[in-house]
Amino acid sequence: MPGASRTIVVNAPIEKVFDVITQYEKYPEFLPEVKGIRTENRKGNTVDVHYKVDVVKTISYSIHVTEERPTRMSWSYIKGEFMKDNKGSWVLEPEGEGKTKATYTVDMALGALVPKSVVSALVETSLPKMLDAFKRRFEAP
């Protein structure tokens, strides 16, 4: 999944979008593939986030997140199953009255045993579905 990036414009102010992105424990409420999530080691604007996600099979991984309110959230890989690396970001920009341009970028290196078809499915299917779920959450009253 090298260099996968998508941009959406949402009908929500930048602060709300940032809040949704950084309320990690609420992800299972609107992202059905997230089966469990917990945070630890919060220090200022950084936190470690531990995921359990179901993509073909259930895998666990951990990332170190840096939050730059209200315009950016980025992460780097700590450890995980079937993964060699996972880094990326959300970059937020005001887009007119009450709207936000949100760009999601991820660079993920999966293990050699992971079939290319799984990697393609993640990019072509999972990423758009995830962004649609975030958009609905951003725009919810």
Can you say where each PLM-predicted feature lies in the sequence?
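A conserved amphipathic terminal alpha-helix motif
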Residues: 103, 107-141
